[in-house]
């Protein structure tokens, strides 16, 4: 494994650990998810380019489309929660609370 792949893999791990540790606020969770998607996109693009695997060249674009949809839904959820409750705590999303 080259150093570039290792750094990208470590970026994914750091984003994943951030998602596990800082999950009280919705904005920090969304930022960690975006970091994970960015590192996946870069890793997928570099793997396809280095292996000359042209049949899968559409996969990074599809991943970017899903990342954009995830970001749009996450930000709309953030706006809805912050307008309703005044904060962006993830615990406000629990519908089973009384």
Curated annotation (Swiss-Prot):
Main location: mitochondrion
Pfam families registered for this protein in UniProt: Oxidored_q2 (PF00420)
Catalytic activity, as annotated: a ubiquinone + NADH + 5 H(+)(in) = a ubiquinol + NAD(+) + 4 H(+)(out)
GO cellular component, one term: respiratory chain complex I
Record membrane topology: Multi-pass membrane protein
Gene Ontology biological-process annotations: ATP synthesis coupled electron transport
Highest rank taxon of the organism: Eukaryota
EC class of the enzyme, as a word: translocase
InterPro entries membership: NADH_UbQ_OxRdtase_chain4L/K (IPR001133), NUOK/Mnh_C1-like (IPR039428)
Compartments (UniProt record): Mitochondrion inner membrane
EC number: 7.1.1.2
Oligomer and partners: Core subunit of respiratory chain NADH dehydrogenase (Complex I) which is composed of 45 different subunits.
PANTHER family: NADH-UBIQUINONE OXIDOREDUCTASE CHAIN 4L (PTHR11434:SF0), NADH-UBIQUINONE OXIDOREDUCTASE SUBUNIT ND4L (PTHR11434)
Family: Belongs to the complex I subunit 4L family.
Protein name: NADH-ubiquinone oxidoreductase chain 4L
């Amino acid at each position: 494994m080259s150093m570039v792949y290792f750094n990208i893999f470590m970026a994914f791990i750091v984003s994943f650990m951030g998602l596990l540790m800082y999950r009280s606020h919705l904005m920090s969770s969304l930022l960690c998810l975006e970091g994970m998607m960015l590192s996946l996109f870069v890793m997928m693009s570099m793997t396809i380019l280095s292996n000359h695997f042209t049949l899968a060249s559409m996969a990074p674009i599809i991943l970017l489309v899903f990342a954009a949809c995830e970001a749009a839904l996450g930000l709309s959820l953030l706006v809805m929660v912050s307008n309703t409750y005044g904060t962006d705590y993830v615990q406000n999303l629990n519908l089973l609370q009384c």
